[in-house]
Curated annotation (Swiss-Prot):
The name this protein goes by in its record: Large ribosomal subunit protein bL19
SUPFAM superfamilies assigned: Translation proteins SH3-like domain
Disulphides: none
Gene designation: rplS
PANTHER family: LARGE RIBOSOMAL SUBUNIT PROTEIN BL19M, RIBOSOMAL PROTEIN L19
Ribonucleoprotein keyword on record: yes
């Protein structure tokens, strides 16, 4: 990578991100701006994918809300995310869990592991 670009992005990288992988259940505290007010909105779900590297890395979180699947993609190093909490660690054998979109109910559960 170009040294100039690398030096610019190093200052933007966050160091308070916990280690999490696809299959883990996370609670994302996202900052939402409504008019002039800013509030924290919590989005809790299963990480189904992580993509990219460095400053452009992002992850997708999926949850079921009122019987409807909702997915949100967050950049890892964005200032719009206040904090990320890992609720539980899941045991999966894939890097991308897109197959969970087709499953529902107990079939969509992920086995928990102790870390």
């Amino acid at each position: 990578m170009n040294p100039l670009i690398q030096s610019l992005t190093e200052g933007q990288l966050r160091t308070d991100i916990p280690a999490f992988r696809p299959g883990d259940t996370v609670r994302v505290h996202a900052k939402v701006v409504e008019g002039t007010r800013e509030r924290i909105q919590i989005f809790e779900g299963v990480v189904i994918a992580r993509k990219g590297a460095g400053i452009s890395e992002n992850y997708t979180v999926r949850k079921i809300s009122n019987g409807v699947g909702v997915e949100r993609t967050f950049p890892i190093h964005t200032p719009r995310v206040d904090k990320i909490e890992v609720v539980r660690y899941g045991k999966v054998r894939r890097a991308k869990l897109y197959y969970l979109r087709a499953l529902q109910g107990k079939a969509a559960r992920i086995k928990e592991i102790r870390r």
